[in-house]
């Protein structure tokens, strides 16, 4: 999947609203009150244009901070922010996942939405946020969910609604600032450093182990080609490759800490792992080749860019008894879980945090 949005690594300071930020400190402040359309938000454009820092742009006030305007491709639909998070969570994570995993997903999705509301993340449509998973976050309407879930609709919707309500207003911060809460379907066993994918280092997006994913259908996938098919696809995507013999013309030059291909020689050209993934429509850049005289088999580990929270890993942690805050603090290193409070229709980060 590709993304046309611009990611921001810095937080915008807003000065005119009230955020009651309560650090978790080992526990979460009490809240006030199955099948996804895609395999996790995969924020992966290409290695060059994936991350754009919006340094210096300030958005001081936010009208209608209790809600969010969602562009559906035809019009902007005003929604309550928490209702929006329900529909995003339903689209981004299977409803059959463990409740604590669904809660972790809701917090990540809410953080991502708040980054859009503050103007730190930009939608390529020019609107605040859209329903295109390749740009912002996946989104399914109630009617689409009924069609997808059939007779399980009431049960599945209630599960996701509860996960969102039980984490109402909670977001992820680092140093008092909203984080860029990237997530993906499956890491293949270990997540990736942000700089290895997006060329920007973020202290909370670092490589961590992600155990328990082996039983997920997203953990591995295979693509098999005849030698002629593989040569044709490679030479079509990369004319300078001029490949003739895959056994001699495929050479992995560099892998990341988690095993993902960073650079690979294909005949007479060298490309990035992401360029290879795009060209062959692979699920990830963590791949291994098995080449014979007649065939080329590519085994992929994981699904997605591998940065941030692995949804399959989150579900595995939840099955093993981890709470949603433990899941989030595992995948987003050193973050705090805080609550947004809106006053006078405006939103900001309160400079001072209070511990509870």
Residue ranges and their predicted role:
Residues 67, 79-98, 206-218:
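Acidic/histidine-rich, surface-exposed loop or edge segments in extracytoplasmic proteins
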Residues 111-296, 301-302:
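Extended substrate/cofactor- or partner-recognition/assembly subdomains adjacent to catalytic sites
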């Amino acid at each position: 999947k590709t993304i046309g949005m611009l990611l921001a690594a810095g937080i915008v300071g807003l000065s005119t609203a009230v955020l009651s930020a309560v650090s978790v400190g080992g526990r979460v402040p009490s809240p006030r009150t199955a099948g996804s359309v895609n395999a996790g938000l995969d924020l992966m454009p290409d290695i060059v244009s994936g991350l754009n820092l919006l340094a210096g742009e300030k958005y001081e006030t936010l009208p209608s901070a209790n809600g969010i305007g969602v562009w559906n491709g035809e019009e902007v639909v005003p929604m309550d922010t928490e209702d929006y998070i329900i529909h995003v969570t339903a689209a981004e994570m299977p409803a059959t996942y463990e409740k604590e995993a669904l809660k972790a997903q809701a917090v990540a999705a809410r953080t991502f939405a708040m980054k859009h509301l503050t103007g730190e993340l930009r939608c390529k449509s020019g609107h605040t946020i859209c329903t295109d998973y390749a740009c912002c976050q996946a989104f399914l309407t109630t009617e689409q969910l009924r069609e997808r879930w059939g007779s399980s609709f009431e049960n599945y919707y209630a599960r996701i609604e509860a996960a969102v309500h039980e984490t109402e207003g909670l977001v992820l911060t680092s140093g008092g600032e909203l984080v860029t809460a990237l997530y993906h379907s499956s890491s293949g066993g270990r997540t990736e450093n942000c700089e290895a994918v997006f060329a920007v280092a973020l202290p909370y997006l670092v490589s961590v182990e992600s155990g328990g994913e082996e039983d997920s259908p997203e953990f591995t996938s295979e693509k098999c080609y005849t030698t002629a098919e593989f040569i044709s696809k490679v030479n079509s995507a990369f004319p300078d490759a001029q490949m003739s013999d895959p056994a001699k013309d495929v050479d992995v030059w560099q892998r990341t800490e988690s095993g993902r291909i960073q650079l690979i020689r294909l005949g007479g050209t060298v490309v990035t792992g992401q360029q290879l993934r795009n060209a062959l429509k692979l699920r990830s850049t963590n791949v291994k080749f098995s080449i014979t005289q007649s065939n080329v088999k590519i085994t992929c580990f994981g699904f997605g860019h591998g940065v941030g929270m692995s949804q399959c890993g989150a579900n595995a942690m939840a099955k093993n008894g981890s709470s949603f805050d433990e899941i989030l603090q595992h995948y987003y290193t050193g973050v705090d879980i805080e609550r947004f409070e809106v006053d006078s229709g405006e939103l900001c980060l309160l400079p001072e945090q209070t511990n509870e």
